[in-house]
């Protein structure tokens, strides 16, 4: 379950939550698969800013994440500038020569898409594992669409995001340790809707290209489990 901490820059005229068909005014927290919240602003409110922190660990962690990622005094414009700077830093790793403007738009759009997933799932040194329902110390990545990405995206990430590759392999090994086998498409837990064991190719390709900063023996065991049971 994902928790969210919301901070509004404008006063609220009304607020509350709902769960299933029950609406409770004045309440600020609710949990469930069919739950949510609502707010209303005073008449005449034309503009406001909303800051959101999210966490798979806890509501308290969501607040901590928000405090670390968006300063209280940061405006929307300042936050946009900070994010744009971060993306420009990543996308500037490759410089194109030649081609048309349309060609460059296509390339950098695709480049941007490749850096979306797998996504970092850990929260400042800890992560919630949907495979065993526990909070662990360490790094975690999730949302691997492996039968789509094992051929090209993961080898590509070895070139443009090499600092993340070992942690991505570590995350696959952790999924095996916490759930029993490496999933075909963790999103965020087992989905069981893809064929094959394409994580094997991702791990093997990383290994032969020199990425070894993970538990290699455990990775091999995980591959063997997949080979024997899928």
Language-model segments: what does each one mean?
Residues 61-63, 120-126, 155-158, 166-169, ...:
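Short, solvent-exposed loop/turn and secondary-structure capping segments
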Residues 19-146:
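Function-dense linear segments that define catalytic or interfacial modules
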Residues 128, 163-209, 213-216, 221-227:
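Helix-terminus loop motifs that line ligand-binding clefts
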Residues 1-3:
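Short, small-residue-biased leader/transition segments that mark boundaries at the very start
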């Amino acid at each position: 379950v994902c928790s969210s901490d919301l901070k509004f820059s404008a006063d609220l005229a009304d607020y509350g939550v709902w769960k299933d068909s029950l609406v409770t005014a004045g309440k600020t927290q609710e949990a469930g698969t069919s739950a949510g919240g609502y707010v209303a602003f005073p008449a005449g409110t034309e503009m406001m800013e909303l800051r959101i922190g999210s966490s798979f660990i806890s509501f308290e962690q969501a607040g901590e994440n928000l405090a670390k990622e968006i300063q209280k005094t940061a405006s929307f414009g300042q936050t946009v500038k900070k994010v744009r700077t971060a993306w420009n830093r990543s996308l500037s790793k490759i410089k194109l020569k030649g081609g048309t403007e349309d060609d460059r738009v296509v390339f950098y759009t695709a480049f941007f898409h490749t850096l979306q997933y797998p996504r970092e799932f850990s929260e400042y040194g800890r992560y919630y594992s949907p495979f065993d329902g526990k909070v662990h110390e360490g790094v975690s990545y999730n949302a691997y669409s492996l039968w789509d990405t094992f051929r090209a995206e993961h080898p590509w990430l070895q070139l443009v995001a090499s600092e993340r590759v070992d942690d991505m392999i570590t995350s696959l090994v952790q999924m095996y340790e916490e759930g029993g086998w490496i999933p075909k498409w963790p999103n965020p837990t087992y989905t069981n809707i893809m064929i094959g064991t394409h994580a094997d190719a991702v791990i093997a390709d990383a290994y032969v290209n020199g990425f070894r900063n993970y538990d290699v023996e455990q990775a091999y065991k995980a591959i063997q489990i997949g080979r024997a049971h899928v």
